[in-house]
């Protein structure tokens, strides 16, 4: 998509958990969210999965962390399995991630800093619904577009194309010199 739009795009997944997201997921799985035990267990599992994700990100990089997150999501999506640290370790091993290395990273002080930075970013963009997509240009203060809900690549492509056209149209009307369109600077966008 980035090549097609001639954009430099950086993608950052932030695994967030909100009370609304927990309840919606529990309803989807036919779990009772009205008991504090179920909510506490769900919250603990979410925090544990989030910690593993960030530890993998620190130790192995974002690409490996995304693979872990997707594999975890896939294994839990049918509702047949419940989250446990043992499941997380099993999935890490299947991705050639050494649980021992992750265990030491989980104790590292920088883990809390990385999580705090992403939480700050989520607060900055006022993310309240999950999943959400934030598109912003890091070179322009106060830029950004918040999209709630699941989006396909085609949806994002259409948004980028329509946004680019609507942003550039007034510029094209100001000048008859079409090459101005092609010299428009390429933004560095972040997709959260």
What residues fall within each predicted segment?
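C-terminal cap of thioredoxin/glutaredoxin-like
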Residues: 1-3, 79-192
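Structural alpha/beta surface segment adjacent to cysteine/selenocysteine redox centers
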Residues: 1-79
């Amino acid at each position: 998509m980035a090549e097609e739009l001639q954009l430099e795009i950086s993608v950052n997944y932030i695994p967030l958990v909100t009370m609304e997201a927990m309840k919606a997921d529990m309803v989807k799985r036919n779990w009772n969210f009205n008991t504090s035990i179920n909510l506490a267990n769900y919250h603990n599992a979410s925090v544990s999965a989030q910690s593993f994700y960030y530890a993998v990100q620190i130790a192995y990089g974002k690409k490996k962390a995304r693979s872990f997150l997707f594999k975890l999501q896939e294994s839990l999506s049918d509702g047949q399995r419940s989250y446990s640290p043992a499941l997380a370790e099993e999935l890490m091993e299947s991705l050639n991630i050494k649980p021992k290395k992750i265990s030491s990273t989980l104790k590292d002080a920088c883990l809390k800093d990385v999580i705090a930075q992403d939480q700050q970013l989520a607060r900055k963009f006022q993310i309240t619904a999950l999943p959400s997509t934030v598109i912003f240009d890091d070179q322009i203060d106060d830029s950004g577009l918040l999209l709630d809900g699941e989006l396909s690549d085609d949806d994002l492509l259409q948004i980028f194309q329509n946004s680019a056209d609507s942003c550039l149209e007034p510029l094209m009307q100001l000048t008859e010199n079409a090459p101005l369109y092609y010299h428009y600077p390429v933004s560095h966008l972040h997709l959260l």
